[in-house]
């Protein structure tokens, strides 16, 4: 259900969610950040052309050193709700479920680690932004961006404390 006070704060494309184990592959998706939750969308109703346009804009912003934490024009809360309903593979994490959120500098890029309370257990999700894609034999990232995740980390921490 849409909370009309909720707003999309940022929409990141080419996000890689690491696999849970050595044998489980990671997945590509979009990370949609509102002021109440994170959503990792792997199956979307967004058109290929619109996705490609926003992905290219994001890549250019990385190259120019600009802020990439911004909403995608034309993608509203209603679209997010439809995408979340579209597939059980799409992931929704309420800020109230987040136990810890940190970033980790790696040699190859910057990793966002989100530890989530799932009731009887906790789980760590690991996200990073891909620079490009290798499409054969399976889609895999060619490299990862080095980035500052602190705007997202600060949003989650300040929202959780209120």
Report the location of each language-model feature.
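Broad, structure-driven detector of short, well-ordered beta-strand segments within folded domains
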Residues: 29-33
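Acidic, Ser/Thr- and proline-rich intrinsically disordered linker/docking segments
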Residues: 26-28, 41-162
């Amino acid at each position: 259900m849409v909370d009309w006070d909720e707003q999309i704060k940022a929409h990141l494309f080419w996000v890689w969610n690491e696999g849970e184990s050595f044998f489980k592959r990671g997945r590509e998706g979009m990370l949609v950040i509102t002021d109440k939750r994170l959503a990792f969308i792997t199956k979307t109703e967004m058109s290929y052309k619109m996705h490609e346009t926003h992905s290219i804009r994001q890549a250019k912003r990385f190259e120019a050193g600009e802020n990439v934490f911004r909403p995608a024009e034309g993608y509203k809360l209603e679209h997010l709700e439809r995408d979340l309903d579209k597939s059980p593979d799409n992931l929704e994490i309420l800020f109230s479920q987040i136990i810890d959120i940190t970033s980790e500098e790696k040699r190859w890029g910057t990793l966002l680690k989100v530890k989530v309370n799932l009731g009887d257990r906790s789980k760590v999700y690991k996200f990073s932004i891909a620079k490009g894609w290798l499409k054969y034999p399976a889609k895999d990232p060619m490299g990862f961006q080095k980035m500052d995740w602190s705007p997202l980390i600060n949003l989650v921490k300040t929202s959780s404390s209120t």
